Amino acid sequence: MYYAVVLVILAVVAGIAGFRGIAGLSFRVAKFLIVIFLVLALVTFLL
């Protein structure tokens, strides 16, 4: 979860600075990590 938060912050900073490619990539990776975290958390709670 830590890396997802770091990548979201990086995406916001890069977006403000005008680096659209880096911001988009960082946001996609962060979103993927958050989805993985939520799936694993759900599986853990169900077991």
From Swiss-Prot:
Protein location: Cell membrane
Transmembrane segments: 5-25, 27-47
Family annotation (InterPro entries): DUF1328
Signal peptide boundaries: none
Protein name per Swiss-Prot or TrEMBL: UPF0391 membrane protein rrnAC2507
Keyword DNA repair: no
Membrane-topology annotation of the record: Multi-pass membrane protein
Keywords from the named record: Cell membrane, Membrane, Transmembrane, Transmembrane helix
Family listed: Belongs to the UPF0391 family.
Gene Ontology terms: cellular component: plasma membrane
Pfam family, one: DUF1328
Keyword Transmembrane: yes
